[in-house]
Amino acid sequence: MFESAALGRSYPAKEYAALENDLRMKLFKAQGTCIEHKLPVLITIAGVDGSGRGAVANMLSEWMDAKTIRNHVFWMQTDEERTRPEAWQFWNKLPAGGEIGVFLGGWYGGTIRRFCCGDIGEREFNASMERWRRLEHTLASSRTVIVKLWLHLGKKVQKARLKDRLKHQEIHHFTPYDKKSAENYDGLVSAAAKAITLTDRVDAPWTVIDAYDGNFRNASVARAIIAAVEAAVAVKRQNAVPVAPT
């Protein structure tokens, strides 16, 4: 599943400079379309540690109008969230019509890492995936545009980046699961592949992205969002009921 996303593809700076301007314009236009049609957009950014999940969130806020973007991080639960139903922390932060909700990790990140670390078994993992699949179907049925991104790195590249982060003491924000799963690359990737297989649907598809090069990663993310919005608008127009002449 991840072989083509671990090739280390990149865009030279000159080529990317021209491409970036075009993608910025299209992404900004897509955001305007969502505002016009009052479409909520839910973007989940998941992936291996060191793949640039935070950088992608920053890029989206820079390339689009940040006033309608809401970024949410789901690395650790608060005390209140632990007393609530599992989905409460997410329902409470879903985007309204015309807004873009960026979920770092989303409802997949924690479950994938707990399964990878052995904290939950396969039955519980599968049950969680089924709940998220149903939730996404419900959201998509109510016109939410769902974009799910898995940012990927090859094993050697990820190991080198993690080592560099440790060297520069950039590990302090990791939860225990983050650190443990980061050191178990094969287990994390296996769990992610299983999650993607179980939840990749037409109304809530996954896009697996080669995150080796920031330029290639950013361009791929922008294209995925633009394509999702265009598809949602096309479906809306297709389903529109024509007004009978008076």
Name each model feature, range by range.
Residues 25-35:
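Pre-Walker A adenine-sensing motif
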Residues 43-46, 144-154, 176-180, 201-220:
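Phosphate-binding beta-loop-alpha motif at adenosine-nucleotide cofactor sites
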Residues 189-246:
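NTP-dependent small-molecule kinase module
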Residues 66-78:
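Short beta-strand-centered segment that lines the nucleotide-binding/catalytic pocket of NTP-utilizing
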Residues 43-60:
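Glycine-rich phosphate-binding P-loop
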Residues 79-137:
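P-loop NTPase motor core
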Residues 115-130, 139-190, 236-244:
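A glycine- and Lys/Arg-enriched "phosphate-lid" helix/loop adjacent to the NTP-binding pocket
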Residues 1-22:
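Charged, amphipathic alpha-helical linker segments immediately N-terminal to NTP-binding catalytic cores
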